[in-house]
From Swiss-Prot:
The gene is rnpA. It is an enzyme of class 3 (hydrolase). SUPFAM superfamilies: Ribosomal protein S5 domain 2-like. This is Ribonuclease P protein component. The lineage of its organism: Bacteria, Pseudomonadati, Thermodesulfobacteriota, Desulfovibrionia, Desulfovibrionales. RNaseP catalyzes the removal of the 5'-leader sequence from pre-tRNA to produce the mature 5'-terminus. It can also cleave other RNA substrates such as 4.5S RNA. The protein component plays an auxiliary but essential role in vivo by binding to the 5'-leader sequence and broadening the substrate specificity of the ribozyme. PANTHER family: RIBONUCLEASE P PROTEIN COMPONENT. It comes from Desulfovibrio desulfuricans (strain ATCC 27774 / DSM 6949 / MB). NCBIfam families: rnpA (TIGR00188).
């Protein structure tokens, strides 16, 4: 059986990498998420993603659901992510209270991908989109 996971090499896992995105990355806001984007120095590498969902969002069930929705979004749209960038998505406090589903997450983050593509050099498939 084939597993459809976001590969480990496309995830940000170390605290130092998260901190670098927070401190030096460009910020983008949506209603439920704060996204930090940091261009990477090594050319030719794929975009990596990381998620941070604090306990302020809700209990473990709620936090895990938000993380699953974010992972699924980035897994399905990884070809459209800006290349050579680290992307950290932080769930805002009220993200757990909202009735988030995949369609709502995609509706919030897809326009953000287009904005990122305009600001980062070497962006991928979204370059030509309005």
């Amino acid at each position: 059986m084939r597993r459809y996971l976001l590969p480990r090499q496309l995830r940000i896992r170390r605290r130092v990498e998260f901190t670098a995105c927070y401190e030096r990355g460009r910020r983008y806001h949506t209603e439920h998420f704060l996204v930090f984007v940091l261009p990477r120095a090594c050319p030719g590498l794929r975009a990596r993603t990381g998620m941070a969902v604090s306990r302020k969002v809700g209990k473990a069930v709620v936090r895990n659901r938000v993380k699953r929705l974010l992972r699924e979004f980035y897994r399905l749209h990884r070809e459209e992510l800006p290349v050579e960038a680290d992307i950290v998505t932080v769930a805002k406090k009220h993200a757990g209270e909202a009735a988030l589903d995949y369609a709502r997450v995609a509706a919030e983050l897809l326009p953000l991908l287009r904005r990122m593509a305009r600001h980062l050099p070497g962006s991928s498939a979204l370059d030509g989109l309005p």
